[in-house]
């Protein structure tokens, strides 16, 4: 059996997801009420039978380390692991990770202990469900040295991705990084014979975007990184075209890069629809996450429509529509949420802590009585007082940092541990 090592890249600063990444790495951002983004690629690896997994971290990684260490613990009869490799300074490497390729290069010393035949390299901040065995089978059958997972996109979305040109056999012959909207890229369209074999290909999706997921033959990867290049997508893959056999693997399923506040918000809210494109309710391929042993949510006299409510919530006489309600969320009487992504809380406050809140004049963790919130992201442990109005009007406002809240991509964000006094209007 070939030895396959999975590497999940989780070291980015996630600046476009700020302030959600103010105190945590992007793959540690809560998602879907109870998960972390990094749970997605780890689950795909485990379901595919690839259980030797390294997670490369660097920026604000404490929360990510804690989550992985408390979640992915294999028994002694399984020759598998999910191990964190934090950026470190050594005699050979005195700088931090300079990019995705540089992160892998600086960890070969650790990878060599597993003596892999192949590397599967994944990103820690995407939403998809992939059988990596099919990806690997395609890699072997095509006799490729490198394989790149690709997904069909429209011309309108092409400027956000690296776009690949392939021949009739799926070999990659050209790579164009984020082509401008006014540039003619008609020659990059999916070949007709390949498009005909793509089941469920939606109209208008005529171009192939790199998903940032790769398979490398072990020796090929080491040779490809025997230089100072720092990034797979911008440098390693484009400069290897013509020198190496690089094959495209056309992934037919749902895939979304959760790299901005807009995509994060919209992808979360899409989970509340009746038939979401990505479905967490999959018996054959569940998404794993940390077991918290929380009680069932307690819901009293509420109206809840097209929403997801995670474990351990206490919701009283509230009106909730098209929203995600994360773990341990407390919502008091008369509150209304419409289009809200609420990440929940890390703990329940005790009676003594609530009494101290009264003496300090701050709200309890959760959402206070009579508060109305629309189109917002509420990060963990936020304290929102009574009769607040957040996102109620539709007036256009400049984006930026306003102290206890942020405005990004038209979405209001209440950051982690924020305090919003009673009666606030945002």
What are these regions (language model features)?
Residues 1-272, 362-363, 398-417, 422:
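Unchanged
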Residues 1-5, 194-204, 218-426:
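Left-handed beta-helix
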